[in-house]
């Protein structure tokens, strides 16, 4: 089971967190601080797996971001590396070569994509095409809702101007 997902920049700034196990807010801050320090200080040639508090942390660096997932000891690290890569590929497909700024300004989309991949710390959808189709449908629904809200606002504005 994946206990949490953490995206951290090279500067140590948290860009995304998703918790699948209960942690108090104080504990979350401590975990983020601790893991950021451990992962950011590791050399690029070292293994992408870290033993930590009875768990394993699997991480991978893409550009200026570290994608980290905390898993149980008995879980397969290579599978989790593939899940991380899968997530990055979907982000790349959606944003067109994703960068840190995409995640900063469109964090809600990054969370939505992650929620399509993982539920309760387990892989839900392995098909990139299916996830892309679902995200596209969601984007279309948002556009329709914006158009309807805009037309309702126009009707209200016209009614109040009379």
UniProtKB/Swiss-Prot annotation:
Localization of this protein: Golgi apparatus; Cytoplasmic vesicle, Clathrin-coated vesicle membrane
Membrane topology value: Peripheral membrane protein
Main location: Golgi
Pfam families tied to this protein: Clat_adaptor_s (PF01217)
Coiled coil: none
Tissue specificity note: Expressed in roots, stems, leaves, flowers and siliques (developing fruits and seeds).
Alphabetical keyword list: Cytoplasmic vesicle, Golgi apparatus, Membrane, Protein transport, Transport
InterPro entries, A to Z: AP1_sigma (IPR044733), AP_complex_ssu (IPR016635), AP_mu_sigma_su (IPR022775), Clathrin_sm-chain_CS (IPR000804), Longin-like_dom_sf (IPR011012)
Domain of life: Eukaryota
GO biological process per UniProt: intracellular protein transport
Gene Ontology MF term list: clathrin adaptor activity
Assigned GO CC terms: AP-1 adaptor complex
Xref: CDD domains: AP1_sigma (cd14831)
SUPFAM superfamilies listed in its UniProt record: SNARE-like
S-S bridge residues: none
Subunit-level organization: Adaptor protein complex 1 (AP-1) is a heterotetramer composed of two large adaptins (gamma-type subunit and beta-type subunit), a medium adaptin (mu-type subunit) and a small adaptin (sigma-type subunit).
Family classification: Belongs to the adaptor complexes small subunit family.
Function: Subunit of clathrin-associated adaptor protein complex 1 that plays a role in protein sorting at the trans-Golgi network and early endosomes (TGN/EE). The AP complexes mediate the recruitment of clathrin to membranes and the recognition of sorting signals within the cytosolic tails of transmembrane cargo molecules.
Protein name: AP-1 complex subunit sigma-2
